[in-house]
Amino acid sequence: MKTGAPIIGLLDCAGLRLQEATDALNAFGEIYTKQVMASGVIPQITGIFGTCGGGLAVVPALTDFTFMEDTKGRLFVNSPNALEGNEISKCDTSSAAYQSEHAGLVDVVGSEEEILGQMRTLI
């Protein structure tokens, strides 16, 4: 934060290991705290290129701009499979289209190349 340079997060993570839950949850708390402290001070930009689930899903919600890859990107706190009747063929609540059009958590959806290009333009 001292230099005022933007923070850019490129996310693709299958989640945390239960064996490391306490340490991982503490790390999430530290990340969230630093994001909140940086809010309004420096730009925060997130690109989701694969799975972004569980506690990691809070990270893009705290950033200023969120980009998501349109075919492989998935964003969820609880697995979409945990919702009764949520079949991908009916409605994939973790998809880029859903997160952008219905949830409002994603600002830009596109291919990996498009997203990286738009992130460069934004910076």
Regions found by a protein language model. Name each.
Residues 1-2, 36:
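Residue-level signal for alpha-helix termini/capping positions
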Residues 4-5, 33:
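Residue-level detector of intrinsically disordered, flexible termini
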Residues 8:
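Serine endopeptidase catalytic core focused on the charge-relay Asp
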Residues 11-123:
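Conserved catalytic cores of soluble enzyme domains
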Residues 3-4, 41:
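Glycine-centered short loops/turns at secondary-structure junctions
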